[in-house]
Amino acid sequence: MQIHALMLADSAQAVDGKLYILGGAWNVLRFPEFPAQLLVGIAVAIDVDWNETNRRHHLDVHFEDADGNKMDPTIGADFEAGRPPGAVAGADLRIVFAVNGPLAIPGPGSYSAVASIGGEELARSRFQAVQASRSN
């Protein structure tokens, strides 16, 4: 099993096996002051190996600061990829997830969204939070 995509966005939706992303793939956020609050969309696409289908798995996504300290929120989801009629034997099956919610950024620095399945880290999306310069 592997994570095909882990993307941070302004908004994300998962509909009919597709991810819809608005304002995605950013890696630098500018804030006039800290602590800062934003709404973040998290989009995840998972390729499930044929031999791992028809079994329950658990996805966890959490945020970390540069020192590896976990931050709220932590998001979890159980999933199972079933083999649909007509699926090619041996082919991976893709599962998509999207969630939107608040994220508090305590100060300038480096942060990561970390995705794990069954306790194994499979993807990391890094970003920087910087102080926006004030215009006169």
Language model region names:
Residues Q2-I117, E121-N136:
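Contiguous segments within soluble domain cores/interaction surfaces
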